[in-house]
């Protein structure tokens, strides 16, 4: 039987040496929200707690300033 090994999760922000997550960096923030607009949890992405809090704050600020949508497009 073949075993499938999951790739080890790692924090991208720690690896890149990011100090602060910016709410104006929409390209990065879009990687951490689902198609329906929900914030992806850290157990899925592997983000450390410190950066998950910064990510949450940045996404909420970007939503408030209409840089990111709160939900997906309704049809």
Curated annotation (Swiss-Prot):
Stated role: Binds as a heterodimer with protein bS6 to the central domain of the 16S rRNA, where it helps stabilize the platform of the 30S subunit.
GO molecular function: small ribosomal subunit rRNA binding; structural constituent of ribosome
Name of the protein in its database record: Small ribosomal subunit protein bS18
Keywords: Acetylation, Ribonucleoprotein, Ribosomal protein, RNA-binding, rRNA-binding
Organism: Salmonella typhimurium (strain LT2 / SGSC1412 / ATCC 700720)
Name of the gene this protein is made from: rpsR
Record bears the keyword Acetylation: yes
UniProt similarity note: Belongs to the bacterial ribosomal protein bS18 family.
InterPro entries: Ribosomal_bS18, Ribosomal_bS18_CS, Ribosomal_bS18_sf
Pfam families given in the database record: Ribosomal_S18 (PF01084)
PROSITE patterns given in the database record: RIBOSOMAL_S18
Residues with PTM N-acetylalanine: 2
SUPFAM superfamilies per UniProt: Ribosomal protein S18
GO biological processes: translation
Source organism, top-level taxon: Bacteria
The UniProt record lists the keyword Acetylation: yes
Gene Ontology cellular component list: cytosolic small ribosomal subunit
Assembly and oligomerization: Part of the 30S ribosomal subunit. Forms a tight heterodimer with protein bS6.
